[in-house]
């Protein structure tokens, strides 16, 4: 029995082997190569090897606070943000007041989402940094964060003096997407129910998240006041006014949070589709024009703009003004022109 202590858990008894393998086992046993009656199954051969690359994230310590030019959040949203972030009255420097990654809720629900241990330090810092962003850009009526996952990753990434994301220090979309997906499993965030497929670009439309009641309770807000402010904002929302104008709702009817959230996501999906179509058309136009001489580029773009100007504006538009518009449009298409635009 001494030989049974170090045997693997998935080892099987020799009697359970195939006849050919039993013969091979007894040959090994008689030769002294087998010391136990339990046989470890042959491991699957693979060419996978641990790489030498670093697994550290690009941005190990992200942080985000509301800029001074932003208006202060009102109601319970402002209360939630102030519970997350504090401001030094002397220096004006902002820092975290509460770290959401250390909330007891994550410890209580850890096993329900398939976790055994606490968050790693890198994930803790990312989770602490993303919650002020979620609260800051959350709509008071639908509690939907008005940024897609890609836009959230760009917002939280470090930027240079010109406001551009530093590629070496960015928070990648895949990393943030995995974090938000785990928050959805915890039940503190919700995700847009339907993700439409864009057939032309062969990719899905942006996904949006919203803060659930469990998430607001973690932030320590007054749920009664939060619900009252939410209903008031929904009654004043543009989405409700659109439904009233379309005859879907009456003047005395209120819109539900689910319906408002679904309508909001539909509008964002349509805006994304429209923007992608315009970008694709501009790309095709640029590919066609870049093969032409500069003068021909300006002429083709001027004729294109002339057809799309309103009739009253096209009537009073001079050739010089139309040429300036064409050059400006060509520069927006990132086509190199030989001469600068006339002033």
UniProtKB/Swiss-Prot annotation:
Q: Can you name the source organism?
A: Escherichia coli
Annotated region (Disordered), positions in chain: 42-61
Name of this chain's protein:
Replication initiation protein
Q: Which InterPro entries match?
A: Plasmid_replication_init_RepA (IPR003446)
Q: What keywords is this UniProt entry annotated with? A: DNA replication, Plasmid
Keyword presence, Ribosomal protein: no
**NCBIfam families cross-referenced by the UniProt entry:** RepA_IncFII_LM (NF040977)
> Record keywords: Hydrolase included?
no
GO-annotated biological processes? DNA replication; plasmid maintenance
Q: What role does this protein play?
A: Probably functions as an initiator for the IncI1 ColIb-P9 replicon.
